[in-house]
Regions:
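Short acidic, Pro/Gly- and aromatic-enriched capping/linker segments at domain boundaries
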Residues: 1-11
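Short, isolated positions in well-ordered beta-strands
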Residues: 20-22
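Short, surface-exposed, charged amphipathic helix/loop patches that serve as local interaction elements
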Residues: 27-123
Length: 123
């Protein structure tokens, strides 16, 4: 038996005049996304705190420099479109989730009904 793992190429997302490579989730990225989600929830009705958390979440995926280029901190609360920021945050998460699901689909155990044993190919 031989196991070979080949990580799929990162999904490429075109946005804001650039192409970003979105990786599958790592333990670090999952932990950080969870922290951002907790910050958003903890912000309650404070839209400014929610937007700061969303912006930090975007930076997790595309880097601080790019997040600053698109959503500068100094104008975040006065000029940024909260719907646009939230949509981009969801899009980045969805892209990363798709990458992770592709890896899982390739390597995860199959349902018992889907397993074919060579000595009995009908089962």
């Amino acid at each position: 038996m031989k196991f070979e793992y080949k990580r799929p190429d990162d999904l490429k997302l075109e946005a804001y005049g650039k192409t970003y490579e979105i990786p599958p989730k790592t333990a670090y990225l999952i932990d950080e996304v969870n922290k951002i989600t907790e910050r958003i929830s903890a912000a309650g009705s404070s839209a400014s705190d929610q937007m700061m958390a969303v912006r930090d979440g975007i930076a997790l995926f595309i880097g601080e420099e790019e997040a600053e280029r698109i959503f500068p901190r100094d104008t975040l609360l006065t000029a940024a479109n909260s719907d646009e920021m939230t949509a981009f945050w969801f899009c980045l998460n969805e892209c990363s989730n798709r990458e992770t699901e592709a890896v899982m689909a390739k390597y995860a155990p199959k349902r018992k009904e889907d397993i074919r044993v060579s000595s009995n190919p009908k089962k």
